[in-house]
Structure formats: structure tokens, C-alpha cells
């Protein structure tokens, strides 16, 4: 029962934040009305981002964010269409109307807040360094001169580029 209540609270926050906040900030924004009129909510996501959104053994897109999106769509009375996107081009996909929403591991930044309507955060996470347990790497400074893999267009990529001296490390 607690889980159901928590999901209901998250749904209320998401629906009101994404749509009501957007309508109050951008006078005349008809996004919600357009989605309801077409009857489909096109969700842009990275389909290789477990547990938030990924493909299961039947190649169906599933995950925590997908479950939340389904409940939001049910509340709005529209069908959910999950649209895998090139994560490096996510803002362009949204700006050109290819998708209605980016929902999955999207980091809130000041720059993004200036150009799009963002909901309240529903997950609190951070950038971390993942290495073998036997590695001598313990801090970001230990990565200097090493090859660092990041997802293109991610906040992890931004973080490493914002760290002086690491531009040449990104692969």
C-alpha cells in the first residue's frame, strides 16, 4: 500500500509539474492539449538505461520510468509511445517535435531550465566513477591521463569536460 501511495504522489507531482508549470511559465502553451487531441504521448528515452528504461528479454521497453509514464498516460487518457532516441540529440528531438517529452536519466541544469520546462526531480542521484575493485583509482584526479568512457550528450560528459585537463581523456 505504501508503494501504491508513493507512486500516486509521484504521478501527481509529475503531471502537475510538467504540464501545469509549463502552462503558467509559457503563456499560451498548448502542449498538453495537443497531446490529448492526438491521443498519444511520445516519450523520448535511452532504451539501454536499466533500471529506468531498457529492453527486456522480449525486446519490450520496460523500467521504472516506463511504469511511471504509463500511469501518467492512463491519468491523461492517452496512449504511451516509447521512442528510443539518440541521447546526444535529445534536445533537438524535443525542439523539433519528434518527441513530446524526455524522460529517463535527464539531468536538470541551469542551461536546460532556460530552454525547456522541467518537472521537479523525482530521483536524486550523482555522477560516480566506476572502476574494478582492485583499481588504484579513488578520485577524479586519479583519472588524469587515463581513457574515460562517457555517454555522449550526458551530464557525465559535461562533468568530465568541466574538469580541467580531462578533455583529451574522453572516448
Question: Regions from the language model: what does each represent?
Answer:
Residues 1-38:
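Short, low-complexity disordered leader/linker segments with a strong preference
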Residues 28-31, 36-105:
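Extracytoplasmic small-molecule ligand-binding "clamshell" domains
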Residues 110-121, 125, 165-169:
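Ligand-binding "clamshell"
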Amino acid at each position: 500500500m505504501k508503494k501504491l501511495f508513493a507512486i500516486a504522489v509521484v504521478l501527481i507531482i509529475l503531471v502537475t509539474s510538467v504540464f501545469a508549470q509549463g502552462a503558467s511559465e509559457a503563456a499560451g502553451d498548448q502542449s498538453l492539449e495537443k497531446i490529448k487531441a492526438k491521443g498519444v504521448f511520445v516519450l523520448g528515452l535511452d532504451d539501454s538505461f536499466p533500471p529506468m528504461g531498457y529492453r527486456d528479454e522480449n525486446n519490450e521497453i520496460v523500467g521504472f520510468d516506463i511504469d511511471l509514464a504509463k500511469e501518467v498516460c492512463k491519468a491523461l487518457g492517452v496512449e504511451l509511445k516509447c521512442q528510443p532516441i539518440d541521447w546526444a540529440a535529445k534536445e533537438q528531438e524535443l525542439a523539433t517535435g519528434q518527441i513530446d517529452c524526455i524522460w529517463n536519466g535527464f539531468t536538470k541544469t541551469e542551461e536546460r531550465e532556460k530552454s525547456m520546462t522541467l518537472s521537479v526531480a523525482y530521483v536524486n542521484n550523482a555522477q560516480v566513477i566506476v572502476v574494478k575493485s582492485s583499481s588504484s583509482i579513488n578520485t577524479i584526479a586519479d583519472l588524469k591521463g587515463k581513457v574515460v568512457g562517457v555517454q555522449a550528450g550526458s551530464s557525465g560528459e559535461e562533468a568530465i569536460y568541466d574538469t580541467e585537463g580531462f578533455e583529451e581523456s574522453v572516448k
